[in-house]
Regions:
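Bacterial N-terminal signal peptides
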Residues: 10-20
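N-terminal soluble domains immediately following signal/targeting peptides that reside
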Residues: 24-133
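Intrinsically disordered, low-complexity sequence elements enriched in Ser/Thr/Gly/Pro
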Residues: 5, 23-24
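Bacterial N-terminal signal peptides that target proteins for export
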Residues: 1-11
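Coiled-coil-like amphipathic alpha-helices with heptad-repeat character
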Residues: 2, 20-21
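Short, flexible active-site loop motifs that bind/organize anionic cofactors or intermediates
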Residues: 3, 14, 59
Length: 133
């Protein structure tokens, strides 16, 4: 009975170790070390064309260049189609994208991108109280 207990406990420890190893593994293409500083212009934000501005920096605060970023704007409620635009790098690590906000209210801005090293980048920002013209 002592040998069966040792085998059973060993099996449990192996399963736990595998589970911990899988749980601690960083998913590929996670862009964990990238910081995104987000701005929107003009202020206050009004219905019509706006410019989405953001800066990408790495873990040591160097600009992240060469990213391909799509900007998506969604109303926070159902019933309106999202709007999309491609961001352009205007200087190293600084990206801008025009985006038409067609309705007053709260918007969610999503960044979908690929960094120059192939890592994926996904970020979300809330833009509250877009004012009517």
């Amino acid at each position: 009975m002592g040998i069966s207990c040792v085998k059973g406990c060993s099996l449990v420890l192996v399963i736990v170790a595998i589970g911990v190893g899988v749980g601690c593994h960083r998913p590929p293409n996670a862009s964990m070390g990238v910081t995104v500083e987000f701005q929107i212009e003009p202020k206050p934000v009004r219905v019509g064309p706006v410019v989405i501005c953001f800066t990408l920096t790495d873990a040591v605060n160097h600009p992240v260049t060469g990213a391909q970023i799509e900007v998506e704007g969604d109303m926070s409620h159902a019933g309106m189609r999202p709007v999309f635009a491609q961001a352009n790098e205007v200087r190293p690590g600084r990206y801008e994208s025009p985006l038409p906000l067609a309705m007053a209210g709260d918007w969610v801005i999503l960044l979908h991108g690929t960094l120059s090293n192939g890592e994926k980048l996904e970020r979300q920002f809330d833009v509250r109280d877009v004012r009517p013209n």
